[in-house]
Amino acid sequence: MDKLADLNYTLSVITSMNDTLHSIIEDPGMAYFPYIASVLTVLFALHKASIPTMKIALKTSKCSYKVIKYCIVTIINTLLKLVGYKEQVTTKDEIEQQMDRIVKEMRRQLEMIDKLTTREIEQVELLKRIHDNLITRPVDVIDMSKEFNQKNIKTLDEWESRKNPYEPSEVTASM
């Protein structure tokens, strides 16, 4: 562990990588050298980051299989992103979590649809009752005795003095 985090060790690995590259590629005009160097740099960075992380994770974790699987999936996804793929590798656990989330959302939507359907049925029943109450039924004879405005009205013939009591008459005032 100390050897992996040692700066001298890191510099010696980089120096040995550079020496190896220069010995393999003798021609200085090689066009692919920057690409090869960047890929090797990324691989070295992954090596330096993943080995200590996995060692610490395996020591502290109770379930080493899941940790190794997660680390490998993360490394593969990183490499796929570097190459330019948009797809990602997923584990069974992630797929099951997504399926559970989808099923939970579908249940929630079905409950909401059920509530809305129940409310709509209640509204339709209420509208039917209102419609039934508003339907006018033809009546042969209208009983006007229950009308308040028509109770005490007498015609001119029915008045005793044959004079309309509601017509204004002359008013005399005392002085």
Swiss-Prot record:
Gene3D superfamilies: 1.20.5.430. One of its GO terms (molecular function) is metal ion binding. Ca(2+) binds at residues 120, 123. GO terms for cellular component: extracellular region; host caveola; host cell rough endoplasmic reticulum membrane; membrane. Keywords: Activation of host autophagy by virus, Calcium, Enterotoxin, Glycoprotein, Host endoplasmic reticulum, Host membrane, Host-virus interaction, Ion channel, Ion transport, Membrane, Metal-binding, Secreted, Signal-anchor, Toxin, Transmembrane, Transmembrane helix, Transport, Viral ion channel, Virulence. InterPro entries: Rotavirus_NSP4 (IPR002107). It is a single-pass type III membrane protein. It holds the Pfam family Rota_NSP4. SUPFAM superfamilies: Rotavirus nonstructural proteins. The chain crosses the membrane at residues 29-51. The keyword Transport applies. Residues 1-28 are lumenal. Plays an essential role in the virus replication cycle by acting as a viroporin. Creates a pore in the host endoplasmic reticulum and as a consequence releases Ca(2+) in the cytoplasm of infected cell. In turn, high levels of cytoplasmic calcium trigger membrane trafficking and transport of viral ER-associated proteins to viroplasms, sites of viral genome replication and immature particle assembly. The secreted form acts as an enterotoxin that causes phospholipase C-dependent elevation of the intracellular calcium concentration in host intestinal mucosa cells. Increased concentration of intracellular calcium disrupts the cytoskeleton and the tight junctions, raising the paracellular permeability. Potentiates chloride ion secretion through a calcium ion-dependent signaling pathway, inducing age-dependent diarrhea. Belongs to the rotavirus NSP4 family. Homotetramer. Interacts with the immature particle in the viroplasm. Interacts with host CAV1, early and late in infection. Interacts with host integrin ITGA1/ITGB1 heterodimer. Interacts with host integrin ITGA2/ITGB1 heterodimer. Interaction with microtubules blocks trafficking to the Golgi apparatus. HAMAP family: ROTA_NSP4. This is Non-structural glycoprotein 4. It comes from Rotavirus A (isolate RVA/Human/Italy/VA70/1975/G4P1A[8]) (RV-A).
